[in-house]
């Protein structure tokens, strides 16, 4: 309307200082523009707009103070705001003041790959993998501070695009004068373990993983078995960052999570994209549900999942997962009590509220529930015929 002359505006100045496109972790991506709008009135106070539940607080911040509070885990910021604030801090150092910094960014916006900083000392690289749709990537996390010790978690690269993404990040790490002290694999599923031979041509580091995961790959004497209660500290410019190991084997035997002050690297326990399967062959539904409850009880600030965007509201998401799995567990039991005895009819009854569920996946998940019901003595199995105990 303003371009057509229908509307006019005087005394208003606005400039785009950068833009960001959300990474390909979800079916829908967003292109965001960030503006600088000088008000000319230092007394203007930001007000909290009603109905905006995604925001926690509105206030003015100096960019350097914003980053400092975020790095101290005092506040949470979405990844685009972190890199924007860092760009502003650098531009202010170069230009002398905020207005000049914004003018410089508007004239020459930052280009190229942006770091995905999910939390202090937690970066993410998206590796394309053949994982469960609608997810298309596995999250490879880089732990530790720039200029300090780093750990690579789940480098799942198996094709040229994945190798290029990983190689770019590794070079960036070395350019920061960082050292890579280990590669950690959260579990042994193929969408988390990449081509180790090709990866070793990009960088070399000992492998840390659970005994079950190490048994699934070729490893050396320099590798380390991680188990419940273990921990490690990554030294960096601001001190040491500690990470603790907890076991969460429901989705996969030997799966581990990494617990730190910034949040929990939660592997394949929950996701905002699609669902998490508990395979009937090797999974454990009881351990999976209790693992979700344990992670929730740790009250993490953020979850860094194996697939999809970071989870900024862990308590709500984990509670939804727990309630959903327990409700499905009850539906499977009720299906058996109603006289359904074979896996096909049990799955059809238990998943009657989910007509879009793939029948083979529904049967596999129903079987996982049945195995747990057998373990607890609620169901009996006689040559794949299930009856109430």
Predicted regions and their residues:
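Active-site segment of metal-dependent pyrophosphate-handling enzymes
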Residues: 1-46
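Active-site HxH/HxHxD metal-binding segment of metal-dependent hydrolases
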Residues: 136, 157-242
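Short, well-ordered beta-strand micro-motif
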Residues: 36-38, 60-62, 117, 126, ...
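Residue-level signal for inorganic ion chemistry
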Residues: 143, 307, 332, 373
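Conserved beta-strand hairpin/beta-sheet module of binuclear metal-dependent hydrolase folds
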Residues: 122-172, 257-269
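Metallo-beta-lactamase
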Residues: 149-152, 157-160, 222, 231, ...
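C-terminal regulatory/interaction regions
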Residues: 334-389
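Extended, hydrophobic interaction surfaces within ordered domains
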Residues: 27-41, 47-110
């Amino acid at each position: 309307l303003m371009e057509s002359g229908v509307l006019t505006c005087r005394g208003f100045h606005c400039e785009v200082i950068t833009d960001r496109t959300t990474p390909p972790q979800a079916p829908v991506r967003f292109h965001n523009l960030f503006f600088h709008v000088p008000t000319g009135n230092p007394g203007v106070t930001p007000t909290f707009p009603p109905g905006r539940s995604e925001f926690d607080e509105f206030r003015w911040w100096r960019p350097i103070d914003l980053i400092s509070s975020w790095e101290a885990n005092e506040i949470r910021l979405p990844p685009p705001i972190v890199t924007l604030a860092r760009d502003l801090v650098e531009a202010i150092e170069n230009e002398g003041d905020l207005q000049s910094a914004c003018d410089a960014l508007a004239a020459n916006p930052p280009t190229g790959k942006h770091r995905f900083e999910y939390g202090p000392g937690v970066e993410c690289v998206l590796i394309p993998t053949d994982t469960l749709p609608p997810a298309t990537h596995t999250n490879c996390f880089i732990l530790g501070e720039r200029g300090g010790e780093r750990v690579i978690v789940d480098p799942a690269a198996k094709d040229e695009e994945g190798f290029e993404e990983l190689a770019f990040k590794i070079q960036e790490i070395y350019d920061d004068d960082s050292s890579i002290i280990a590669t950690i694999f959260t579990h042994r599923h193929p969408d988390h373990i990449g081509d180790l031979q090709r990866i070793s041509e990009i960088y070399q580091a000992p492998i840390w993983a659970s005994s079950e995961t190490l048994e699934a790959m070729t490893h050396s004497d320099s590798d380390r078995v991680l188990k419940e209660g273990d921990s490690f500290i990554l030294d960096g410019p601001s001190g040491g960052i500690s990470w603790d190991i907890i076991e969460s084997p429901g989705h996969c035997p030997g799966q581990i999570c990494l617990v730190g002050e910034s949040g929990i690297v939660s592997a394949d326990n929950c996701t905002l994209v699609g669902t998490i399967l508990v395979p009937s062959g090797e999974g454990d539904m009881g351990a999976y549900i209790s693992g979700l409850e344990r992670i929730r009880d740790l009250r993490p600030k953020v979850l860094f999942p194996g697939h999809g965007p970071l989870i900024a509201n862990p308590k709500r998401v984990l509670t939804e997962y727990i309630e959903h799995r327990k409700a499905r567990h009850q539906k499977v039991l009720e299906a058996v009590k109603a006289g359904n005895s074979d896996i096909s009819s049990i799955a059809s009854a238990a998943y009657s509220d989910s007509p879009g569920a793939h029948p083979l996946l529904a049967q596999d998940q129903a079987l996982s529930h049945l195995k747990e019901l057998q373990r607890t003595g609620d169901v009996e199995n006689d040559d794949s015929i299930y009856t109430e105990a």
